[in-house]
């Protein structure tokens, strides 16, 4: 080819590229735009019968634009991967040249239109259309020659490759623009579906707040982040901790549990960090600690709020450095554990009182999961009750069902002991059923064995009874019972519900606990939902020794919310708002660790009076 002709062709190709780029940017109608591009190729460079095929979601090439074919005819033409010359280009991602279509056995001629060539020779040039390195289609054109097949198609391949690249970018642009929208829509749908998380392990729940907890467990499980589980006793903190471990990449490694409240400080250090032989009396061999045993897995520290401030400093160092020494040893041991902590205490309040280190709090409070008490997820009482009934029946090889009336009674209870108390209640009722049916009369309320009212009274006052956490929200636990003698009550302090009247008993019989009336079946009450008679609990005054001098007149009672209470020595023991004497005595003994002298000071009594009252009400002294 003479130099002048070569220069002219190059200029024409450059002009055509310019026209193609203008066409591709002129309209959002892809099919119409591609037809205009093919017409420009035919008009400028005599590249006839242009075809543009695009890959569908099923990986099939479909004809979307063609010179000389109607849209209806083009819609019927498709090629699969490796089928014909066009399919080969898709499969290999490489250009293809057929000098003479009439002699090519792979040519399928599905588009037709070449029957009127007479003595002319048709050659085909095809190139892949790529976007971001991926083949998304094929561009083909025909070269018609009167002088036989051409010998060189290199310039056509290079030119068509540039055109195909422009087409590929045009095809990809709408998808690129839609990706953020699709991602946002996907995120929105996932967020809406999060509360509908699949149940895990033995966690039975249908209430929205527990479903959100399940979704939170699914989100946090894949990571190594420390988790702090907060909730009242009996809400299932260990169950959630095990679920997080079982759904994590560490599920095949150990899950080690330590109850920090059950071990004294000296023993807790040995249990967590281990000890060397001879470290102390009785250490006859080396002992691996829980941090060492849990390496590669999960360590669950239950009741972490009960460890002493001195030990908290040692624990903080391990959590920060992921290394420790055994008791009596000097070798530093590296560990790789995921830490999950749980508590039913108000750690923020404990920090304010100097009982919990703030730096340890910030170390463990990375991801917090709040477990709602059972009274705040009443939708779960029915499913949980049926689950425990089925579990008891399976464990004991029997058939057991529960009446709807009994379930209604359970739905009206307050459950200060949460799910654990519900399970125990179901088990008690199951043992009382005679024919495999749990009826209303099988429940503890009907048998005067329900202690929830007493526990609820102390919990409402803010006291911790036997390890049962006071009523707490996401972060509020009142450890000081409002309105107790000698302590002013806050203005918004909750008032303890009235104790239900005891069920009449035969003469001579004594009930150590106030009981629910009517089996909790008549109507709502502060505790179990039972209607209670409007009769105050009988108060038995405590006999006091004769005073040596006339006592001053007691001041008139005042409201605990409007004025400060009188001095402890002047508080009458049978004050109606203070509850029965027996209840106040139990409260004081629990508060003071069953030390009579301290309880006496708390109640404004003498030690002798407290001792007499304990004997009178048959209250057994707890020994620790």
Swiss-Prot record:
Residues 29-171 form the GAF domain. Residues 549-563 have a biased composition (Low complexity). Residues 582-624 are annotated as: C-terminal DNA-binding domain. Keywords: Activator, ATP-binding, DNA-binding, Metal-binding, Nitrogen fixation, Nucleotide-binding, Transcription, Transcription regulation, Two-component regulatory system. InterPro entries: AAA+_ATPase (IPR003593), GAF (IPR003018), GAF-like_dom_sf (IPR029016), HTH_Fis (IPR002197), Nif-specific_regulatory_prot (IPR010113), P-loop_NTPase (IPR027417), Sigma_54_int (IPR002078), Sigma_54_int_dom_ATP-bd_1 (IPR025662). It holds the Pfam family HTH_8. PROSITE patterns: SIGMA54_INTERACT_1 (PS00675), SIGMA54_INTERACT_2 (PS00676), SIGMA54_INTERACT_3 (PS00688), SIGMA54_INTERACT_4 (PS50045). Residues 477-508, 549-578 are annotated as: Disordered. Residues 432-581 are annotated as: Inter-domain linker. GO terms for molecular function: ATP binding; ATP hydrolysis activity; DNA-binding transcription factor activity; metal ion binding; sequence-specific DNA binding. A divalent metal cation binds at residues 445, 450. ATP binds at residues 231-238, 294-303. One of its GO terms (biological process) is nitrogen fixation. It comes from the Bacteria. Residues 203-431 form the Sigma-54 factor interaction domain. The keyword ATP-binding applies. The keyword Cell inner membrane does not apply. CDD domains: AAA (cd00009). Residues 596-615 bind DNA. Required for activation of most nif operons, which are directly involved in nitrogen fixation. Interacts with sigma-54. This is Nif-specific regulatory protein. It comes from Azospirillum lipoferum.
């Amino acid at each position: 080819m003479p130099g002048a002709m070569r220069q002219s062709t190059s200029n024409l190709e450059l002009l055509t590229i310019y026209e193609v780029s203008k066409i591709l940017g002129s309209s959002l109608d892809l099919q119409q735009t591609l037809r205009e591009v093919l017409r420009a190729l035919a008009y400028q460079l005599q590249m006839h019968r242009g075809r543009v095929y695009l890959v569908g979601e099923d990986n099939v090439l479909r004809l979307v634009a063609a010179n000389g074919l109607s849209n209806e005819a083009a819609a019927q033409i498709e090629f699969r991967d490796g089928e014909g010359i066009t399919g080969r280009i898709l499969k290999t991602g490489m250009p293809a040249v057929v000098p003479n279509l009439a002699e090519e056995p792979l040519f399928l001629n599905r588009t037709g239109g070449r029957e009127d060539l007479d003595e002319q020779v048709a050659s085909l040039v095809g190139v892949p259309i790529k976007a971001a390195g991926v083949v998304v289609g094929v561009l083909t054109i025909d070269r018609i020659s009167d002088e036989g097949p051409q010998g060189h198609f290199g310039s056509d391949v290079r030119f068509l490759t540039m055109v195909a690249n422009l087409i590929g970018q045009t095809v990809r642009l709408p998808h690129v623009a839609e990706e953020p929208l699709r991602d946002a829509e996907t995120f929105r749908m996932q967020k809406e579906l999060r509360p509908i998380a699949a149940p895990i392990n033995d966690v039975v729940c249908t209430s929205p707040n527990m479903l959100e907890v399940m979704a939170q467990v699914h989100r946090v499980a894949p990571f190594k982040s420390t988790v702090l589980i907060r909730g009242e006793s009996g809400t299932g903190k260990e169950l959630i901790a095990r679920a997080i471990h079982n759904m994590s990449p560490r599920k095949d490694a150990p899950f080690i549990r330590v109850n920090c409240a059950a071990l004294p400080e000296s023993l807790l250090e040995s249990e967590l960090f281990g000890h060397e032989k001879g470290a102390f009396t009785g250490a006859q061999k080396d002992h691996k600690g829980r941090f060492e045993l849990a390496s590669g897995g999960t360590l669950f520290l239950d009741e972490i709020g009960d460890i002493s401030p001195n030990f908290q400093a040692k624990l903080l160092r391990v959590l920060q450095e992921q290394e420790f020494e055994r008791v009596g040893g000097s070798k530093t041991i590296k560990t790789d554990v995921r830490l999950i902590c749980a508590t039913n205490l108000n750690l923020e309040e404990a920090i304010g009182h100097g009982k919990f280190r703030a730096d340890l709090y910030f170390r463990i409070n990375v991801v917090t999961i709040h477990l709602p008490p059972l009274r705040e997820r009443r939708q779960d009482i029915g499913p949980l009750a049926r689950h425990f009934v089925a579990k008891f029946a399976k464990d004991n090889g029997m058939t057991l069902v529960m009446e709807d009336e009994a379930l209604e009674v359970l739905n009206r209870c307050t459950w200060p002991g949460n799910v654990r108390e519900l399970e125990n209640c179901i088990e008690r009722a199951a043992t009382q059923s005679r024919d495999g049916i749990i009826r209303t009369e099988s429940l503890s309320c009907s048998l005067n064995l329900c202690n929830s009212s007493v526990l609820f009274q102390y919990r409402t006052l803010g006291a911790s009874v036997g390890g049962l956490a006071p009523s707490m929200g996401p972060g509020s636990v009142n450890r000081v019972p409002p309105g107790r003698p000698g302590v002013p009550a806050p203005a918004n302090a909750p008032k303890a519900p009235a104790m239900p009247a005891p069920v009449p008993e035969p003469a001579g019989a004594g009930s150590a606990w106030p009981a629910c009336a009517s089996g909790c079946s008549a109507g709502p009450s502060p505790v179990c939902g039972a209607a209670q008679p409007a009769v105050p609990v009988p108060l038995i005054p405590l006999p006091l020794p004769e005073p040596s001098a006339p006592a001053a007149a007691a001041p008139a009672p005042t409201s605990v919310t409007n004025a400060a209470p009188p001095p402890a020595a002047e508080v009458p023991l049978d004050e109606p708002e203070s509850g029965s004497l027996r209840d106040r005595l139990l409260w004081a003994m629990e508060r003071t660790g069953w030390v009579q002298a301290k309880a006496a000071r708390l109640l404004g009594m003498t030690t002798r009076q407290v001792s007499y009252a304990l004997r009178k009400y048959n209250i057994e002294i707890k020994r620790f």
